[in-house]
Amino acid sequence: MTYRIFETDGFKDDLAQDFGGRRKKILLKLRAYVYPKLAIQPRLGSNIRKLRNYSPETWRYRIGEYRFFYQIDEQKKIIFMIAADHRKQAYRK
């Protein structure tokens, strides 16, 4: 069964950033490649990692220097995209 992708308001705000002049390219990759891949298998892939010590369970997808964070609702089969940021800023609390 495939998962549905939901972009939270915070994630949409994060997507408004410039991404070092690569915004258009990153958005295209997210929607054309990453989302279809996550919809099928959100926990498996070389660019996917489960974050330790996060509650609720949080995952990240890496595209170059940028990190895209998401949570999975298994019962409803929904992936909530929650944040996007440069790797230098991404893990600061």
Segments predicted by a language model, with ranges:
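Short, solvent-exposed aromatic-acidic interface loops
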Residues: A84-K88
